[in-house]
Structures are given as structure tokens and as C-alpha cells.
Amino acid sequence: MRGGAGMCFASMEAAGSRGMGKGASRRRTARSTAPVGALVERVVVAPAPVEQQRGAGRPEAHPQSVAARAVVTVRRRRKEDAKDRFAEQLDALADRVGRSVLLELVSTETDPRKGTPKKSKPSALVGWFDKKDVKAERVVYTAEFAVDAGFGEPGAVTVLNRHQREFYIESIVVEGFPTGPAHFTCNSWVQPTRVSRDRRVFFSNRPYLPSETPPGLRELRLRELADLRGDGTGERRITDRVYDYDVYNDLGNPDKGVASARPVLGGEQMPYPRRMRTGRPSTATDASAESRVEYPEPIYVSRDEEFEEGKNEMLSEGAIKALLHNFMPLLVSSVSPDIRDFAGFHDVDNLFKEGLRLKQALHDQLFQKIPFVRKIQENSEGLLRYDTPDIIKKDKFAWLRDDEFARQALAGINPVNIERLQAFPPVSKLDPAVYGPPESAITEEHIIGHLDGMSVQEAVEGSRLYMLDYHDIFLPFLDRINAQDGRKAYGTRAVFFLTAAGTLKPIAIELCLPPMTDGCKRAKRVFTPPADATSNWLWQLAKAHVCSNDAGVHQLINHWLRTHACMEPFIIAAHRQMSAMHPIFKLLKPHMRYTLKINALARQILINGDGVIESGFTPGNVCMEMSAFAYRELWRLDQEGLPADLIRRGMAVEDPSQPHGLRLLIEDYPYAADGLLLWSAISRWCEAYVAAYYPSDEAVQADYELQSWYAEAVQSGHADKRGAPWWPRLSTPGDLASLLTTLVWLCSAQHAALNFGQYPLGGYIPNRPPLMRRLVPAEGDPEYAHLVADPHRFFLSALPSLTQTTTFMTVIDTLSTHSADEEYLGERPDEAWTADPAALAAAREFAADVRRAEEEIERRNADPSRRNRCGAGVLPYELMAPSSGPGITCRGVPNSVTI
């Protein structure tokens, strides 16, 4: 890179205020690298109008001019109602009488006399009226231009929509210039002039660093960035394209009463990442709270962040399932109170079988009077049955075994909390003045008999002791959790021993409650592997509490906070501070698809007060406060990359002799072993890509768009942590490649590992209850006799109720589903995403690396020596296998956080 003043992340204060950025869409793009004549499937080119065939519609090319043509691919809605069809006909008629769509070519060069960009005369898009009845999803229109022979290369196209409706441009290809076809990947909704009188700008696929921007495009680059940043005022309309920041102040609704209010997340009192600003008015009773938009009313995200139709259809089906599965248990339980709890495990099994009681109950006279139920009967066959989760397909009783409980810490849906125990006993970091002595109640006597003849010290020094520690994250909230109806929790620790076979076995579980009164010793109970029938059920209950805490930490912290919320500021900043022409924006673009929309939906129905998360997980109405506590105490970007995270948890040590520079202390740790394959592939890809544009440290430091992106993501997007000393620097190509690797990893592989196994591995509630309703009874408690008398029923009564179970299963069924338009790691459906041959070559090598990683994962899953992923009833670990078909597959690594 050449030119530009030196600036790096070390001088963030200056950088944050003067960057610029470019919004880009998340839409799937056409494969338009072929000549225009070889158009993609389903694209229809209708015959040109008669006038055009006579030559009237095409500008005459003089000897000193160039005749050029723009071929515009417009994607139509698949499903249109009568109102849409009528509006389309009106637009076609308006087009016929001159209210057409106008295109204008902008050269990369400036006029030497005027100093302004060279532009063509506006040209109308031809064929809208003639193709008004075409049924294809993609329809191609053309515009003809005659420009001076010295026009230069087209670097941008402007579009003015004089119709009444918005339309979606997928791509533009401009032909006729000596430099060859110019490709413009658009994937954007263009608003009509009645909404916005500004011309939309689309840049060609040639990447330009800011200092290398051709003279003819500099002004447009600046203007487009300013448009996307907006002015930070006013309420956003759903047609807007503006990206900005706000705190999480719309999760509660204080106008409904104190119980419906929720604290603001973000700010000194409760630090949190920032979310997309909507500018909605405050609530009537609390000026600090933003008024809510309840689902299914649309919540603002930049227009091009909306889902495509295929994604919307998938979520609509999921919404129908939620209605049915939630509505039916509520209906039946209102008539038959005795089935609110599971009477036995057979009731749980019946959820996965055809002919459920819920379905049969539809035939009762009572239900026949309800039109909605009659409609379900007639139209929704198949939506009333849950698929059998993978976790019980191969071995129905595997979940009861200790080895399976331990295996899931390495290869389950939350394999990112297991840590090596480096000192014994474990010690809390909480204030002992408030929470009592920090030492764990687990003693050497509790575990010595389970260490295969080793002493505790030998086991620690030999890296044989591991732990799931949910003590400190839960204990500060336990009083408020346990005060809620039907919710009971502990601060938990589970200690595991690494056997000679390379598998883990649980050897102690500690359940802790806070002190009842000042000076009172808090309750600490330790459970060890059972010796008789009663202790077996106490042990099962203790494991269930560990699993429930694990489920809460997984959803609130590892999944939502780390891969959704903490990524949002980097995405917002990218659109605000980096042009679509910027090579780094082009690299990041597929990894930002759908994330802002998903996060906005989460604020509507998942993480909001009384939403799915609060209703389904033990912490209840303190769920998001726990998430904020974890952000304040635990989150650091420099430890979010896989190698740094493994080292932090003591699961790996640096070893230059190993393929990835790390040696895993549990060799058969499927998440880590497979993750390192993908991490390395992503790292090589980012290094090669960065090297193509940044030959020196100075090139990185002088790129003001790049520096402004990172500075703003930190200073504005993570404002509550902006002064932390651990933020990675952005001063060298190595710094940049490392930062990009971490971000791509979090948006793709890390999110996939934490998301797409939720139903397959968590859909059988006894295996992994998200919510517990009873504490573990002690001998002498009234409940203890109930446990002894009917352990099955007591165990199930501690788990979620039937309604809670079916609601939760429905949600994670939807969350675990790949949509048909998913784009997977290594894929770039838009083959014309860049005109840079070096970048395309690096992308092809990356795709090959990803394929090789998938082949290695398949080999590992077939290796009987890897007992944590292969064996009788053992599920293979495929969550890091990059490819997948649509649906619930328990595999597949999408490019971005798409669900």
C-alpha cells in the first residue's frame, strides 16, 4: 500500500472519529463470472421490445465513443400476494410511460478539465414492462450506454429507482469496454425515490485500499460511508441502511409493571457489548428503557441485513412448530392437570413417537369447538411429532452412564468449559468476606480411591485431573434464582480423572449454596460415585444440576455472549468504517451474513424479559445479568482464539514440534483436535490474503479505514472495556491476520460447535436439563422419603415440566436447523466477489484446506482408538465437519452466525 498518514490501534482515540465504512448485504449472489450470454439457471431474458430491435432504444455510438451495455439481474420475490402482484403491474405500467429505473456509469478516472468523475448519461433499464409476467426468480434487464472513448474503466454504477416499490438487484455486469466485463456484486434492496431520492452506488469487484482509490471513485467512497453511518439521531425506518450503536435497553417493558422491567445492559453499572441502534422512543415509565417491538412486528436492522425468503420460510415453519408444540401441551394440561409432570421415562419417550396423547386429544369434542385446532388437524400432520435426538438413537441409556456424562464435556454441545485442575483443592475467586472461605469442600479423601493408585499431587502434576467449575458464575445469583418459583440451583464443581484409556470419569461433584445469614457457614455438599441404589439417584441428581448449570453457561455466555453479542460491534463497525471496495471488508463479508438480524430477533423473543431463555433456563429473570457478569469478569478478545483459549484452560501447552504448535493434554479431545484443523486453515487463509495487500507494517498502520474499523469496534462497540490493556494491537500484517483469524473462527467454527448440536445432543431433557426445579434432598428432609419411594418420578419432577420441556425442545429444534441457503466455510457462492487473482487463488487453497480437514475428521470418527468419538453407542463428533445439507444434521460450519 502507498501513501496515507501513519496510524495504528495505539492511537485509537484519533482513529475512531475519522473512519469511514461501507454497508454490504448478506444476500446470496449469482455466479456471474461467465459471459452475459451464459446466464445462471432460472434467469429469463425476454425478447427485447420491438422499438429496441429497430435500434431506437440503443444510444448511437460515434466513431470516438464506446457502446456499452449493463446487464442487471433482479431477484423477484418467490411468493407474492395479490397486493404485491398489483403493485408490480403498476410499476410495469409506470415504466412504460417513462417512470423507469435509471442507471449511470461512473469512471475510475476524473475529467481533467472539471476535476470531477467521468459519468455516462443516465440510461433507462429496458424490459420491465415486457417481463412483468415472467415467473422466474431471477430476471435480467439491460441498459445501453454510449460513452466517450476516453471514458476509462467503469468503477461504479449508480441506480435511481423511479418505481413505487423497492426491488432487489443481485448483480450488474457492464460489457463493451476494452478492459473487459466489469462485475458489480450488488445484493441489495434499492428504494424508490419516494423513500430516498439519493442514487444508490454500487462499486465494481476490484478491491482498493483507501490510498489506492481511483480518483473517480474517491468522492463516492466517502459519500457511501457517510450514508451508512447516518447522523445518530431519529428513529430508523425499516427501509434505512444506517448502522449505529446502542445499549441493550429494550429487553424489558417497564410499562407493564416492575416485574417486566429489566436492567440496561451496557454502561458502567452493567458492562456489555453494544447492539444495533434503532432509535425507538423511550417507554412511558422509564426514560432509560427503549420501547419494545414485539414479534412478529419487524425490528430494525439495515435493510440488506434482512433474511432472504428461504431463510424466512424456514423460521416461519419453526414458528409454526413452536405454536403447535407449545399450544398443545397448554391445552391438554389445562384439562388434565395430572400430565403437567412426567410420570415416568416412558412419557419422555412418547414425545418422539407418533400417536402422542397430545395428538390423539385433538379428537375430543372439546377441541373440535376450537377452529385453530381443527385447522391443525386438517393441515399440520407431522408437525406434532418430535424427532428422536441423536443422543439416544444409538444407546437409549447412554446418558445415565458416568463415562458419557464426562465424554460430553469433551465432545458435547458445550466442550469449551472443561479445564485442567492445576492446584488442589479448587479455590474460588469471589470475595471471601461475602461468600465465605474460598476453598472447595472436595478433599483428598473424597477422590483418592478413584485415581488408579496415584496420589492427588501426582494426579495434578501428571495432568490427570480436570474440572467443570460453575461455582463463581452462579453463586452471586443463587439467592435470586432460588427465590423464583420452580427454580433451584447450586454453584457446582465437577472433578474428572483422565484414565489410561484417554477418557474422563467423574470422581466428585460439589454443590454449594450461599450463606443463609451473616456469619453462617454456607452449605457445601460433596457427592462421589455411588455405592448403592439411593446414592446412585443422589449422584444422578447432582449430575443433573451440573448439566443444568452447563446448559445455562453454554447458552448465556459461550453461545450468546461470545459468538453473537461480542461479534455485533465488529460487524457494525465494518459497515460504518470500511468501504465495500476494501479488501478486508470483502474477506469479512460472508462471515457477517444474517448475524445482525439474528441478534435483533433474539432481543425480541429469546433474551428478552420472560422470553425463551428466561423461561427455559434455571437462572430465569437474572439470565442476562449473569451474561453481563461474565462479560465484565471473563471476556477478553485476546483469549477468544482457539489456541489461546486452550492454553488459558490448561488443556494444551505450546509445542513447536506439533502440527499446530500446540500439544493437547487430552489427545482425544474432539472439539479441540478438530477445531485446530479449521483454525489452522482459517489462519493460513487470512495470512495469505493479508500478505496480498499489506507488504509492511507501515501499510497496516497507514490504512485509516482499517484502523478506524478496529478502533471504533473497541471504543464504541465495546465501550465498557475500551481501556483494558489486553486488546490486541493492529500495527503489523501479523496482527491483522491474527485478528481476522479470531473473528472468522468465532463467527464460523466456534459458533457451529456451540449451536448445531443443541437439539441432537440436548433434545433429550433427562440428559441435559436446562432447568432444575428441586434441590438434592438430604437424609431427614421430607423430600428424601419421596426420592427413596419413587426415584424415577422424583428425578423427573426435578426436571422441567412437560410444557417447559416441549417449549424448550421446539426452540432448540429451530436453533439447530440449517436453512437451505446456508453458505459453509470455504464456500463463496458469488464467484465474482473479487477481481484480484491472488485473492481468488488464496480462496481456492482455503477451500481445499477445509475439504482436507473434513476428510481427516471423517477418518478420526472411524478410528476405534479414539474412544470419545467412536465405540458402542458413541456418537461421532461431526460439529466441526464443514459441510452439511439442510435441516438438523449435527454437523456443518456456516460462514457466519446465521441462527
From Swiss-Prot:
Start and end residues of each stretch annotated as Disordered: 15-34, 48-68, 258-291
InterPro entries: LipOase, LipOase_C, LipOase_C_sf, LipOase_CS, LipOase_Fe_BS, LipOase_plant, Lipoxy_PLAT/LH2, Lipoxygenase_dom_3
A GO biological-process term: oxylipin biosynthetic process
Enzyme Commission identifier(s): 1.13.11.12
Swiss-Prot/TrEMBL cofactor(s): Fe cation
Binding-site residues for Fe cation, renumbered to this chain: 559, 564, 751, 755, 899
Catalytic activity: (9Z,12Z)-octadecadienoate + O2 = (13S)-hydroperoxy-(9Z,11E)-octadecadienoate; (9Z,12Z,15Z)-octadecatrienoate + O2 = (13S)-hydroperoxy-(9Z,11E,15Z)-octadecatrienoate
PROSITE patterns according to UniProt: LIPOXYGENASE_1, LIPOXYGENASE_2, LIPOXYGENASE_3, PLAT
Pfam families: Lipoxygenase, PLAT
Functional pathway: Lipid metabolism; oxylipin biosynthesis
Keywords: Dioxygenase, Fatty acid biosynthesis, Fatty acid metabolism, Iron, Lipid biosynthesis, Lipid metabolism, Metal-binding, Oxidoreductase, Oxylipin biosynthesis
CDD domains: PLAT_LH2 (cd01751)
GO molecular function: linoleate 13S-lipoxygenase activity; metal ion binding; oxidoreductase activity, acting on single donors with incorporation of molecular oxygen, incorporation of two atoms of oxygen
Domain Lipoxygenase: 207-899
Record text on cofactor binding: Binds 1 Fe cation per subunit. Iron is tightly bound.
PLAT domain: residues covered: 68-204
Function, as annotated: Plant lipoxygenase may be involved in a number of diverse aspects of plant physiology including growth and development, pest resistance, and senescence or responses to wounding. Catalyzes the hydroperoxidation of lipids containing a cis,cis-1,4-pentadiene structure.
Record family assignment: Belongs to the lipoxygenase family.
Name of protein: Putative lipoxygenase 5
Species: Oryza sativa subsp. japonica
Lineage: Eukaryota, Viridiplantae, Streptophyta, Embryophyta, Tracheophyta
